[in-house]
Amino acid sequence: MKLHAVGGSREGIIMPVTEYLERNAREYPDEVALVELNPDEKDTRRMTWKEFGLIEPTTYSPYRREITWSVFNEKANRFANMLIGRGIKKGDKVAIIMYNCLEWLPIYFGVLKTGAIAVPFNFRYDSDEIYYCAELA
């Protein structure tokens, strides 16, 4: 996916969306990039991405997590490297089935950084819907 930059010295320049992430990580490394907020519940999810160090549950109430641009980019890079290490290459399709959460975008960008195609599925889909959509992807 390519976007047109708006404003500043980059006006009119076309660059991949992953380059925006890398640019923001360089220019605004310590500024907040993503916020996850749910004031009514604590983090009780169990997810399989923990082995890659992408999940960092908190015990704060109200529940709020945030990550900076540099952390966002680092997590996307780590996930991309994991995928490449498992044989994912440009043009491959990678399904993403997970809850809406702070880790969703670093994982999505990690897929894009490999050159693969991200295929997000709604986590509410049943197995038949997942199979049907996977066949269409």
Pin down the residues of each PLM region:
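Short, contiguous pre-domain boundary segments
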Residues: 1-7
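Structured binding elements
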Residues: 115
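Short beta->alpha connector loops at strand-helix junctions that form conserved
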Residues: 121-122
